[in-house]
């Protein structure tokens, strides 16, 4: 199980620091590729932890492939999300301070496939997002994407 905290005085102290990537991937109708996480039940952009030996761009390409079945090409940067008030606690005792680099990307191949990390994966219309269970940090990344900022968010 996984529990996310944001600006919560009751959040546990982190015992690890993790670099992670995520991507906003659209279909032809402008819907966003999202997964319902098996560990929390929340909806999220596909993404995950960077592995030793890979670049940030390689990390997001691998994570999207593993979690969705799609091959992607990175097309831009939504932003960097490094707020120390965002803590993620796992049932195995890991409590991470995670920072995330969120990209934009387009699909170049593959077929949709659900991984063990998800219970559902699909393209979600923007108007539907408010009704989905989702952590505020995911909503922030999506808001920045939809704002079509001239420069990436650096925070």
Q: Where on the chain are the PLM-derived regions?
A:
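Acidic, metal-coordinating catalytic segment for phosphate/diphosphate chemistry
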Residues: 1-22
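Short connector loops at helix/strand junctions that flank enzyme active sites
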Residues: 18, 38-40, 45, 72, ...
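Short, well-ordered beta-strand micro-motif
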Residues: 25, 102-106, 123-125
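Conserved Nudix-box catalytic region and its N-terminal flanking loop in Nudix hydrolases
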Residues: 27-67
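Nudix hydrolase/Nudix homology domain
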Residues: 41-42, 112-155
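A short coil-to-beta-strand element that immediately follows conserved catalytic motifs
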Residues: 71-80
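Active-site-adjacent beta-strand/loop module that shapes the phosphate/pyrophosphate-binding cleft
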Residues: 82-111
